[in-house]
C-alpha cells in the first residue's frame, strides 16, 4: 500500500485594495451593468504599488507554514505557478524560499501555464514527498491581473496567492 500524501497546511493572501466594475467601465466608455451581470462581479482585488506575485506568495507561504505547524527550513521544494512573475530572469521561487527560511537545500522553480501552473507545482511537490525525496514540499499559485485594456479579463482577473504545504503526516486533505 502506498503512503498517502496530501495537504498539511494552506494559506492565502488577497490584497485589500479593490476596484469596482463601474470604474473600469467608465474608463473605456463601456456598459458596467452588462459586465456586472455577465461576469457576476462587482469588484476585483488589485495590489498596491509595492506588491507583486512575489510579495503575495510570501504572505500566503507564511500562512501555510503556520497552519501546517512547521518551520520553513523543512520545505524541500517550492514551485510557484504564475502568469505574472515580476522578473524575466530571476525566479520568484528563490526570493520566496529565502523569505520563509527554506534555503539552502530547497529545490525551486517557477512554472508558467495560465491557470494550471499552481496546481502543477502542487503535483510535483506531492510526487517528491511520495517518492521519499523530501519530507514537505510547497506549491504556490499567485497572479496579478494581466488583462488587456478593455478586455473582459481587465474586469475579472484580480490579484492573490494561495500556498499549499504537501506532506504525508497530519493531512488536512488528500
Task: List PLM regions with ranges.
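Flexible, glycine-rich active-site loops centered on histidine and acidic residues
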Residues: 130-164, 169
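Short acidic, glycine/serine/threonine-rich loops at helix termini
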Residues: 18-19, 89-92, 123, 148-154
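Beta-strand segments within the central parallel beta-sheet cores of soluble alpha/beta enzyme folds
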Residues: 73-81, 107-110, 135-142, 174
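Phosphate/pyrophosphate-binding loops at sites that engage ATP/ADP/AMP, CoA/4′-phosphopantetheine
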Residues: 60-76
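Buried hydrophobic positions in well-ordered alpha/beta secondary-structure cores of metabolic enzymes
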Residues: 7-9, 35, 64, 78, ...
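Conserved catalytic cysteine-centered active-site region
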Residues: 34-52, 83-137
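Acidic, glycine-rich active-site loops and adjacent beta-strand->loop/helix elements
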Residues: 13, 81-87, 113-118, 141-146, ...
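Condensing-enzyme catalytic core mediating Claisen C-C bond formation in acyl metabolism
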Residues: 1-50, 154-174
Amino acid at each position: 500500500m502506498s503512503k498517502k500524501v496530501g495537504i498539511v497546511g494552506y494559506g492565502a493572501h488577497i490584497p485589500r485594495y479593490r476596484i469596482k466594475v463601474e470604474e473600469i467601465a467608465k474608463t473605456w466608455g463601456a456598459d458596467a451593468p452588462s459586465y456586472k451581470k455577465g461576469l457576476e462581479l462587482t469588484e476585483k482585488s488589485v495590489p498596491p504599488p509595492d506588491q507583486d506575485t512575489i510579495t503575495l506568495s510570501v504572505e500566503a507561504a507564511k500562512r501555510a507554514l503556520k497552519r501546517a505547524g512547521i518551520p520553513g527550513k523543512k520545505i524541500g521544494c517550492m514551485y510557484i505557478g504564475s502568469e505574472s512573475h515580476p522578473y524575466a530572469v530571476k525566479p520568484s521561487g528563490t526570493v520566496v524560499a529565502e523569505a520563509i527560511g527554506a534555503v539552502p537545500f530547497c529545490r525551486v522553480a517557477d512554472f508558467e501555464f495560465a491557470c494550471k501552473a499552481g496546481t502543477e507545482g502542487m503535483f510535483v511537490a506531492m510526487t517528491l514527498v511520495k517518492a521519499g525525496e523530501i519530507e514537505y514540499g510547497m506549491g504556490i499559485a499567485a497572479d496579478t491581473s494581466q488583462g488587456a485594456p478593455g478586455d473582459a479579463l481587465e474586469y475579472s482577473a484580480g490579484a492573490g496567492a494561495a500556498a499549499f504545504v504537501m506532506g504525508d503526516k497530519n493531512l488536512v486533505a488528500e
